């Protein structure tokens, strides 16, 4: 549609708001069944001038909001024929084209020239003053609605739509340093109170998380979750070299040293290196007083009398499996 006064092409405006129903008895006031709600009560209608000032993105938002509102009313059981506004939205597909004319580029009627803009501002001020005065017709008819600003209804609907939208990607903010939870035993601080509670269990020796299969207790829920994988037989960590699978990542890390030949654990007494920390711990038994007598032989192969280890402690498990690591280092 072309506006001859401005020489602009104004998009076809949506239909106007329907007139309120009349009382069958002939009364002039608005009549409606008690509790009845119609689409016209919640819809937003624009005049031709107001519609021409909307950007293509705003018109698309208006279309989505109106269709969503109509769908909500249908879900609530509000019947009746399809409103003219919804039919117009579905028919006028060319209005939602992103390449549609932008009113800012073509100058909105309120921005055509300074004189017209000043006149429009005066009319808006006069209209605002008229809205502030009580209207006798509106005062006598509480059901009638006062006219609203062109974009007020659309902004309210868009805000309500954003509030009702589920926030799937919302993450809780990380507390600041002054809001962290500190342990009263060791002073260590944690971001979340639940983590602090589990940490306090380690000081008290409590193990409130028990396995339902074997009854073993754990101080942390994560430890119980890893333990349950043992009963399920899960081995998610697989070696890329040989394909062997492990239940824990730490076990896979230790196994990879077999392929790489890395030996990060060094004996502080003799400097011998080991790939496993347990291997170094077993090796250190040979440096204890009387440790060489456990096997009954010295490194040179000479037979000696067995000598008890200090404290009558037994060597660790695997002593007889790895005898070479318990020999005295030269």
Curated annotation (Swiss-Prot):
Record's keyword terms, sorted: Metal-binding, Repeat, Zinc, Zinc-finger
GO biological process, one term: regulation of DNA-templated transcription
InterPro entries: KRAB, KRAB_dom_sf, Znf_C2H2_sf, Znf_C2H2_type
Zinc finger (C2H2-type): 181-203, 209-231, 237-259, 265-287
Residue stretches of biased makeup (Pro residues): 12-23
Pfam families hit by this protein: KRAB, zf-C2H2
Region of interest (Disordered), residue spans: 1-32, 99-150
Ranges annotated as spanning the membrane: none
SMART domains: KRAB, ZnF_C2H2
Residues in KRAB domain copies: 37-108
Gene3D superfamilies in the record: 6.10.140.140, Classic Zinc Finger
Name this polypeptide is given: Zinc finger protein 747
Taxonomic placement: Eukaryota, Metazoa, Chordata, Craniata, Vertebrata
């Amino acid at each position: 549609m072309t506006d001859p006064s401005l020489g602009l092409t104004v998009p076809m405006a949506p239909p106007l708001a329907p007139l309120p129903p009349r009382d069958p008895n002939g009364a002039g006031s608005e009549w409606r069944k008690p509790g009845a709600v119609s689409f016209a009560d919640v819809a937003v209608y624009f005049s031709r001038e107001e519609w021409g000032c909307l950007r293509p993105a705003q018109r698309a938002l208006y279309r989505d909001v109106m269709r969503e509102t109509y769908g909500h009313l249908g879900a609530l059981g509000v019947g009746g024929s399809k409103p003219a506004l919804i039919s117009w939205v579905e028919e006028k597909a060319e209005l939602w084209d992103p390449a549609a004319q932008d009113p800012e580029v073509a100058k909105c009627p309120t921005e055509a020239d300074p004189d017209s803009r000043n006149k429009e501002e005066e009319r808006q001020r006069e209209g605002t003053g008229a809205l502030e005065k009580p209207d006798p017709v509106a005062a006598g008819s509480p059901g009638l609605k006062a006219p609203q600003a062109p974009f007020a209804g659309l902004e309210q609907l868009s805000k309500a739509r954003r509030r009702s939208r589920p926030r799937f990607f919302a993450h809780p903010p990380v507390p600041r340093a002054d809001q962290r939870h500190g342990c009263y035993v060791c002073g260590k601080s944690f971001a979340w109170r639940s983590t602090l509670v589990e940490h306090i269990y380690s000081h008290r020796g409590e193990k409130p998380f028990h396995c339902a299969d074997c009854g073993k207790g754990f101080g942390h829920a994560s430890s119980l979750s890893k333990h349950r994988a043992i009963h399920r037989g899960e081995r998610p960590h697989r070696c890329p070299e040989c394909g062997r699978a492990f239940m824990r990542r730490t076990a896979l890390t230790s196994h990879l040293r077999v392929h790489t030949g890395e030996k990060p654990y060094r004996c502080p007494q003799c400097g011998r290196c080991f790939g496993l920390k347990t291997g170094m711990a077993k090796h250190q038994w040979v440096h204890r007083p009387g440790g060489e007598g456990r096997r009954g032989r010295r490194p040179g192969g000479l037979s000696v009398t067995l000598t008890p280890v200090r404290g009558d402690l037994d060597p660790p498990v695997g002593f007889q499996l790895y005898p070479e690591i318990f020999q005295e280092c030269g």
